[in-house]
Curated annotation (Swiss-Prot):
Specifically catalyzes the AdoMet-dependent 2'-O-ribose methylation of cytidine at position 56 in tRNAs. The keyword S-adenosyl-L-methionine applies. The keyword S-adenosyl-L-methionine applies. Belongs to the aTrm56 family. This is tRNA (cytidine(56)-2'-O)-methyltransferase. It holds the Pfam family Trm56. Its EC number is 2.1.1.206. One of its GO terms (cellular component) is cytoplasm.
Length: 132
């Protein structure tokens, strides 16, 4: 986010006590979505999540587990959402979730705090530095 922007849009953290974050988020009125291959399929749930998120005071907190996620997260998240019910990478789960939440419009978001931006090319690459 330092280079490509999005600080006002996203917050990414590695934390020592993720359970504390989830508890606090929910206590403050936030919605927690846990991405897991064991959850309800995203296409069956995305409309409900989108509608529900509008009734909460905080933005969505997305929890993405790895191989050995504690059962606690399955019971303390508002939604357990499956991005397919086969093993997959955490990054791909987040990408698909964001695509569904933003209905594909995330491809056209331009962050005002970006230090660089890309001009799409059929061949080669073109990156332009901003004055930020």
């Amino acid at each position: 986010m330092e280079v490509w922007g999005g600080k006002s849009y996203f917050k990414v953290e590695f934390v020592d006590n993720p359970k504390k974050i989830v508890k606090s988020w929910r206590e403050k009125g936030g919605l927690v979505v846990h991405l897991t291959m064991y959850g309800k399929m995203i296409d069956d749930m995305i409309d409900e999540i989108t509608k529900a998120s509008k009734n909460f005071t905080l933005p969505l907190l997305v929890v993405i587990g790895s191989e050995k996620v504690e059962g606690w997260y399955y019971y303390n998240s508002d939604y357990n959402i499956g991005i397919g019910n086969q093993p997959h990478s955490e990054v791909s789960a987040l990408a698909i979730f964001l695509d569904r939440i933003y209905k594909g419009e995330e491809l056209y978001i331009h962050f005002s705090d970006a230090k660089f931006y890309i001009i799409p090319q059929l061949k080669g690459k073109r990156v332009v530095k901003t004055d930020k």
